[in-house]
Design a protein with these regions (language model features):
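C-terminal ends and interior cores of transmembrane alpha-helices
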Residues: 115-138, 343-360
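Central cavity-lining transmembrane alpha-helices of secondary-active solute carriers
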Residues: 83-100, 304-317
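A gly/Pro-rich, aromatic-decorated transmembrane alpha-helix motif that marks the paired
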Residues: 53, 94-98, 126, 191-206, ...
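Hydrophobic core of transmembrane alpha-helices in multi-pass small-molecule transporters
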Residues: 135-158, 365-366, 441-460
Length: 555
C-alpha cells in the first residue's frame, strides 16, 4: 500500500478525464502538435544562442565592476567560463530527463523549467542596473553568474524533453516522417539562431548589455507561451512513476545505456571542436581583417554564417545529397556521423592554417598588438613597432605625435603615443621604425570557409544523433537516452575547458597558443575519427517507437 501511495504521489499523471492524449494518433500525416513544438524551439534557440553569441565578447570587453570600472577577463579565462557554462547546460539534461520520464511528464517539465530559464535571462539583463542598485544587490559579475546558472538549469533541463517530445507525437503509421521532422526541428533551431547571432552583437555594441541580454529573454518568454498554447494538441506520454527506476536500471535498461554510451564519447570530441565557434574562433576573428564581401563584420557576428548555412544545408542534404549518395553507398546513421567527424577535422585544419597566417604577419612586424576595444581611458607603458586597430569608416587618418580614433569607434582614444605618423585603412594601422607600412592580415573569409565545412559536419552529426538517439532508446527511456546524447556536448566542453585550464599560466593566458592550439584539437579529432570506424562496424541498431507493445521494450 505504501509503495502504491508513493507511486501515485510521484507519478503526477494528468487525470484520464482531461483532454490530453496519451498515445499517438494513427495518421500518415504530420501530428497536430508539431507546429507548436517547432515554433517554441525557434524562439527558445533565439534566446539561447543570442545570449551565448556575445558571452565571450562581453566578458573580455564589457564586464565592469559595480562602480563602473573595467573587470575584464583574459581570452583564456573567458574561454574557460564559456565552455564550463555550456558543459553545465548540457549536464542538466540528465536531471530534466529523469524528472520528465519518472515524475512530471515532458510537458509539465518543459513548462516549469522554461520559467526558470526566463528568470536566468532576467538576471543577465540586470547587469546594466545603475551603480547604486548594483552596489546594493550584486555586481555585474554576480548577476552574470546567477543568470548563467539559471539558464544552464532551465535550458539544460528542457533539452532532452523537447526533442523526445517531438518523437512522442509519432507512431508506426507516420514513422517515415520522423527523419524529415527532426530535420525541420533543427531548421527551426537555426532559424532562431541566425537572427539572434546577427542582432545581439549589434545590440551589445549600440545599446549595451542590458538590451543585448534582455531581448533574448523576451523571446524565451514568447517560446514558453507558444508551447503552452499547444497543450491540447500534444500527445502526453505518461510518466512511469517509481516503476521507471526499476525499468531503467534493470538489465534491459542498462544494456541500452551501455550500448549507446561509447558512441556518445566519440561525439563528445566533435562538440569539443564545434562549440569553439563561440570562443576560440571569436578571438581568432578579432585578429583578422573583418572587411569581407563589402561588409565590416563584428567578430561575434561571423558565427551567423553557421545557422544561415544550416537553413540551406538541411533541405539540400535531405532532398539532394542523401538521395544521390544512397545510389552509391548505404548511408546508415553511423556512416553519416563518421563522415561528419572527417569534415570536422578539415574545418579545424583550415582554422589552424588561418591562425598560422596571422602569426606569420605578426612576426613580420615583431610587434606588440594593443587592444583597441576597451572602454574608458587606457594607460599603456609599452613600445610597439606595429599596431592594429579596427576601422569604422573608409577614410585614412594621418596624425602627428598622437593617435586617436573617432568617437563612433566605441569611444576609444589613445593619447600621448610616441609615434611619427599613423594610417588607419581597411581595419589596419601599422608603424615600424617611424615608417608606415600596410599589413596583410588574413581575411575573415578563411573562417567563413571553415564554417562552410563544419556546418556540413553538424548536419551529418547533430541531426543524425537526434533521430538515432530517439529511435534507439526503449520507449520508457526516451528522454533519458536523449539526455545522455546531450551529455556528450557537456563532456566535449569540459574537455575544452580542461585544456584551457591546464595550459593557463599565472597571468591567465594559455601556453598552448596560436596555431598550436588549433592543431592540438585537430589531432584529437583525427584520433576520434579513426577509432569511430570500429563503432560503425560493430554497432547493431534496433528501433523503438511509442506505439510498440510494452513487451518490445523489455527485450
Amino acid at each position: 500500500m505504501f509503495a502504491r501511495a508513493c507511486e501515485n504521489i510521484f507519478t503526477l499523471v494528468p487525470p484520464m478525464s482531461t483532454p490530453y492524449r496519451t498515445a499517438p494518433i494513427e495518421t500518415k500525416g504530420i501530428p497536430a502538435g508539431i507546429p507548436y513544438i517547432v515554433g517554441n524551439e525557434a524562439a527558445e534557440r533565439f534566446s539561447f544562442y543570442g545570449m551565448k553569441t556575445i558571452l565571450v565578447v562581453f566578458m573580455t570587453q564589457y564586464l565592469l565592476s559595480a562602480q563602473g570600472q573595467p573587470n575584464y577577463m583574459t581570452d583564456t579565462q573567458a574561454r574557460e567560463w564559456m565552455h564550463l557554462f555550456v558543459a553545465s547546460a548540457y549536464f542538466f539534461p540528465v536531471i530534466g530527463a529523469i524528472i520528465a520520464d519518472a515524475f512530471l511528464g515532458k510537458y509539465v517539465t518543459i513548462l516549469a523549467l522554461s520559467m526558470v530559464y526566463c528568470a536566468g535571462h532576467l538576471c543577465l539583463a540586470l547587469i546594466d542596473l545603475p551603480s547604486a542598485a548594483l552596489s546594493a544587490t550584486l555586481d555585474p559579475k554576480g548577476w552574470m553568474v546567477a543568470g548563467l546558472v539559471l539558464i544552464a538549469i532551465g535550458s539544460g533541463g528542457i533539452k532532452p524533453c523537447v526533442s523526445a517530445h517531438v518523437g512522442d507525437q509519432f507512431g508506426h503509421a507516420n514513422k517515415h516522417l520522423i527523419e524529415k521532422i527532426f530535420g525541420w526541428f533543427y531548421f527551426a533551431i537555426n532559424f532562431g539562431s541566425f537572427f539572434s547571432t546577427l542582432l545581439t552583437p549589434w545590440l551589445l555594441k549600440n545599446y549595451g548589455a542590458g538590451w543585448a541580454f534582455g531581448v533574448p529573454g523576451i523571446l524565451m518568454a514568447l517560446a514558453t507561451f507558444v508551447f503552452w498554447m499547444g497543450r491540447n494538441k500534444f500527445t502526453h506520454i505518461q510518466p512511469r512513476g517509481l516503476r521507471y527506476f526499476g525499468e531503467t536500471f534493470g538489465f534491459s535498461g542498462l544494456k541500452s545505456i551501455f550500448k549507446l554510451v561509447p558512441l556518445y564519447l566519440f561525439v563528445a570530441m566533435f562538440w569539443s571542436l564545434y562549440d569553439q565557434g563561440g570562443s576560440a574562433w571569436v578571438e581568432q576573428a578579432q585578429q583578422m581583417n573583418l572587411h569581407f564581401m563589402g561588409i565590416v563584420w563584428l567578430e561575434s557576428q561571423v558565427q551567423a554564417i553557421n545557422p544561415l548555412l544550416i537553413l540551406i544545408y538541411i533541405p539540400l542534404f535531405a532532398y539532394v545529397i542523401y538521395p544521390l549518395a544512397s545510389k552509391v553507398i548505404k548511408l546508415t546513421p553511423l556512416r553519416k556521423i563518421l563522415i561528419g567527424f572527417a569534415l570536422t577535422v578539415v574545418s579545424f585544419a583550415i582554422a589552424a592554417y588561418a591562425q598560422g597566417l596571422i602569426e606569420k604577419e605578426e612576426a613580420r612586424f615583431d610587434e606588440t598588438i594593443l587592444p583597441m576595444m576597451l572602454r574608458g581611458d587606457v594607460d599603456v607603458s609599452a613600445t610597439c613597432k606595429a599596431m592594429r586597430a579596427e576601422e569604422k569608416n573608409s577614410c585614412a587618418v594621418q596624425l602627428e605625435a598622437a593617435f586617436a580614433l573617432p568617437t563612433d569607434n566605441s569611444g576609444d582614444n589613445i593619447k600621448n603615443a610616441a609615434m611619427a605618423k599613423s594610417i588607419i585603412r581597411a581595419g589596419v594601422a601599422v608603424l615600424k621604425d617611424g615608417t608606415t607600412q600596410r599589413a596583410n592580415w588574413p581575411t575573415v573569409g578563411w573562417q567563413l570557409l571553415a564554417y562552410v565545412v563544419i556546418t556540413a559536419a553538424e548536419v551529418l552529426v547533430s541531426i543524425t544523433c537526434l533521430e538515432f538517439s530517439y529511435t534507439q532508446a526503449p520507449k520508457q527511456m526516451k528522454s533519458l537516452i536523449m539526455s545522455f546524447y546531450l551529455l556528450s556536448v557537456s563532456l566535449g566542453n569540459l574537455f575544452t575547458a580542461a585544456v584551457n585550464r591546464f595550459t593557463m599560466d599565472a597571468s591567465g593566458n594559455s601556453t598552448l597558443i596560436g596555431a598550436n592550439y588549433y592543431w592540438f584539437f585537430t589531432k584529437v579529432m583525427i584520433g576520434a575519427t579513426v577509432l569511430f570506424i570500429f563503432v560503425v562496424v560493430l554497432y547493431k541498431p534496433r528501433q523503438y517507437l511509442q506505439d510498440d507493445p510494452d513487451a518490445a521494450s523489455a527485450h
